[in-house]
Swiss-Prot record:
The gene is tsaD. One of its GO terms (molecular function) is iron ion binding. Required for the formation of a threonylcarbamoyl group on adenosine at position 37 (t(6)A37) in tRNAs that read codons beginning with adenine. Is involved in the transfer of the threonylcarbamoyl moiety of threonylcarbamoyl-AMP (TC-AMP) to the N6 group of A37, together with TsaE and TsaB. TsaD likely plays a direct catalytic role in this reaction. It comes from the Bacteria. Its cofactor is Fe(2+). This is tRNA N6-adenosine threonylcarbamoyltransferase. Its EC number is 2.3.1.234. The lineage of its organism: Bacteria, Pseudomonadati, Campylobacterota, Epsilonproteobacteria, Campylobacterales.
């Protein structure tokens, strides 16, 4: 088995993945959402301290699941990039300690690659080549994945990420963090879902394949300010619905532009923001239009987790891509290449 560790942001997670058939044997996770909610976003120093507290607790649960028999573990895998430096280092320190004390090889894994492999948790075979939309609090990307060592970034956001824009809109409406499920609930509760959109679709006439949410976010801010003295539930629902609809339509329009160029046969959607049901439905319709198979990450493995890191690290294990402890380090940025 591979013991994998994830601590790139505000989720502490450990998992055990069986090498022979890629079966997820155990998955443990502690979310920090309630600790960051009052701040409207993740506070790195708080996240780091909580990882230092939570990771040892999760390791104890791993010990119990193994009956304290670590002989079944053949490698340690850790997310080392991209992410918050102060949280990545907490996971790396645990991984190094386990690697040294158990005399096991160490695998460094890219967090974005891990999200791609969340599509294949519990599956021995992957479905590559495929194209992937990654939407989360930190990223809005289209990726092309040909194999483990050949994953390229085709499109990215020029400013805010998809998930980050939901967080900021929720904060404008004084509704808390994380904003994704809050804004989604507003949209679901809105009583007039078929009216024309009140916010502009970003980059609608731009020839560039990219994402942008800052203009849409600013349009929401102006609407909130206009209704400052009458920001009741119905107004909040209306803003939430129209913002979400415009944000998803932007993703659809840009991805459709990509589809017309590349005509992918398989398209995956991953990342924490991919739990949004309206987004999933919109992409079901888009993929049906282009006769493209849609593959969705399971809802429980959309947000950051060690199970996806365990699944991706199986590929590294087979290729013996091990890193000496003295060379193991972290990076706040991904090393995945931009498409050339």
């Amino acid at each position: 088995m591979i013991l994998s560790i994830e601590s790139s942001c505000d989720d502490s997670s450990l998992a055990l993945t069986r090498i022979e058939d890629a079966k997820l044997i155990a998955h443990f996770k502690i979310s920090q959402e309630k600790h960051h909610s009052s701040y409207g976003g993740v506070v790195p120093e708080i996240a780091s301290r909580l990882h230092a507290e939570n990771l040892p607790l999760l390791l104890e649960r791993v010990k119990i699941s193994l009956n304290k028999d670590f002989s079944k573990i053949k490698a340690i895998a850790i997310t080392n990039q991209p992410g918050l430096s102060v949280t990545l280092i907490e996971g790396l320190m645990m991984a190094k300690a386990l690697s040294l004390s158990l005399n096991l090889p160490l695998i460094l894994e890219d967090h974005l690659r891990g999200h791609v492999y969340s599509l294949f948790i519990n599956e021995k075979q992957t479905r590559m080549p495929l194209s992937v939309l990654l939407v989360s609090g930190g990223h809005s990307l289209i990726l092309e994945a040909r194999d483990y060592e050949d994953i390229k970034i085709v499109a990215t956001s020029l400013d805010d990420s998809f998930g980050e824009s939901f967080d900021k809109v929720s904060k404008m409406l004084d509704l808390g963090y994380p904003g994704g499920p809050i804004v989604e609930k507003l949209a679901l509760d809105y009583a007039h879902p078929n009216e024309p959109l009140m916010f502009p679709i970003p980059l609608k006439n731009s020839p560039n394949l990219a994402f942008s949410f800052s203009g849409l976010k600013n349009a929401v801010r102006l609407e909130v300010e206009k209704n400052a003295h009458n920001l009741n539930d119905e107004v909040k629902q209306k803003i939430g619905y129209h913002f979400q609809s415009a944000a998803i339509e932007h993703l659809i329009q840009q991805t459709k532009r990509y589809f017309k160029i590349k005509r992918p046969k398989i398209f995956g959607i991953v990342g924490g923001a991919s739990q949004n049901l309206a987004l999933r439905k919109a992409f079901e319709d888009l993929c049906a239009e282009f006769d493209c198979e849609l593959v969705l990450a399971p809802l429980e493995f959309c947000s950051d987790n060690a199970a996806m890191i365990g699944r991706s690290s199986l590929e590294a294990y087979q290729k013996k891509r091990f890193i000496p402890l003295e060379k193991a380090d972290i990076s706040p940025r991904t090393l995945l290449k931009n498409f050339e």
